[in-house]
Amino acid sequence: MMWKALLIAVLAIAHCQAVLETDANTLVLLDNLAIRETHSIFFKSLQDRGFKLTYKLADDSSLLLSKYGEYLYKNVIIFAPSVEEFGGDVSVERLAQFVDDGGNVLVAGSEKSGDALREFASECGFELDEENAAVIDHLHYDVSDAGEHTTILTSAKNLIQADTIVGKANRQADAAPLLYRGTGLIADKENPLVLKLLTAESTAYSYNPEASVSDYPHAVGRGTLLIAALQARNNARVVFSGSLLFFSDESFTTAVQYAQSGVFHKLAGNRDVAESISKWVFGETGRLRVASVQHHKEGELLPPDQAYTITDPVVYTIGIEELVQGEWRAFKASDIQLEFVRIDPFVRTYLKQTNTGAYQAKFKIPDVYGVYQFKVDYNRVGYTHLYSTTQVSVRPLEHTQYERFIPSAFPYYTSAFSMMIGVFVFSFVFLHFKDEPVGRAAKEDKKSQ
């Protein structure tokens, strides 16, 4: 029985290793080491999923992101709101380059966010509100609030409609509200890559709670972002939260109650949402890849040696996989399209999933020769951008491949044959019809008289 229990434990541990080995190394930058204790539940959840965390102070002079041209970490967590300047090899420019090279970053700020976080936020398409500005909601605040109405509660319905990022269960109507205390974020409206993960209630605004409101707030109502994300074109991911409290043990374990309505919840929904967001930003969920691509004529198994011929019936098959619990499994979707492109798409059709899990489409090549591409461009919120192209040539028919009689030319055939028949009839009549001389006919008439 002991060996069975040991086997079950080993399997359970292996199942918990949801992260790939190559993505496990994570650098955690902190304002002070006390944050490691106040956010221990969040960090432990990462370690339980297989992440290898390296804790450093954000201004440590020995910080290194890369060594000998290779990055030491795949992910970076910045829980250092007040840092004015990073230490060592880390800087805003290096972090931006880290993202450009495919790295993932999770950042949590506060009302007193330093210049370093503000500069990095602007690089990612976000803007932190002014220093000392906090999100205020006079109608949706927690009973634990000190009187400034900055410890707010926001409904789970304000989460983005993307189950891959925030989890399907966390968006249910009966889900617990989310506890938040921090500054507001403003998204760049011209940046199509920015995702609004969590917004405030319509009654909220971001302003300095110790000052009277003399100017219109920078962020008001649903335009006040609490958590925002960026998925770059290279599929690197960045999540920015205006609240460090959101990921703390306090928000994970404390009961919450609306001060106005008195509605009580045993726990806030922060823990489940924070874990779902961390899974997404570090690539544990929402990752797709192309496993295989095949194309050939219908009835054959291999592609042609040189080129397809116009009007050939072809079969295109692509295998798409999704990372689930650290394993690549067949991806299931009903909205994946294939385009057969020569400058513009000549064919656009849906791919249907086969019994093997791959996606397949059958169509006839257009009656236009040239250089084409089989193109799959799948871009959905929460998933990595899937892009696959395969170039093929399409040639015209050889002279021995044309039909003897082309149906579309039947009118011309009829015209030609009718002309031939008409000429023949005319020639026959012209050659065999003979008129009698007029003088001879008159003499015969006189004789008869």
From Swiss-Prot:
It comes from the Eukaryota. GO terms for cellular component: endomembrane system; oligosaccharyltransferase complex. The chain crosses the membrane at residues 413-433. Pfam families: OST48_MD (PF23358), OST48_N (PF03345). Keywords: Endoplasmic reticulum, Membrane, Signal, Transmembrane, Transmembrane helix. Pathway: Protein modification; protein glycosylation. It is found in: Endoplasmic reticulum membrane. Residues 434-449 are cytoplasmic. The keyword Signal applies. Residues 1-18 form the signal peptide. It is a single-pass type I membrane protein. GO terms for biological process: protein N-linked glycosylation via asparagine. Residues 19-412 are lumenal. InterPro entries: DDOST_48_kDa_subunit (IPR005013), OST48_MD (IPR055459), OST48_N (IPR055457). Belongs to the DDOST 48 kDa subunit family. Component of the oligosaccharyltransferase (OST) complex. PANTHER family: DOLICHYL-DIPHOSPHOOLIGOSACCHARIDE--PROTEIN GLYCOSYLTRANSFERASE 48 KDA SUBUNIT. Subunit of the oligosaccharyl transferase (OST) complex that catalyzes the initial transfer of a defined glycan (Glc(3)Man(9)GlcNAc(2) in eukaryotes) from the lipid carrier dolichol-pyrophosphate to an asparagine residue within an Asn-X-Ser/Thr consensus motif in nascent polypeptide chains, the first step in protein N-glycosylation. N-glycosylation occurs cotranslationally and the complex associates with the Sec61 complex at the channel-forming translocon complex that mediates protein translocation across the endoplasmic reticulum (ER). All subunits are required for a maximal enzyme activity. This is Dolichyl-diphosphooligosaccharide--protein glycosyltransferase 48 kDa subunit. It comes from Drosophila melanogaster (Fruit fly).
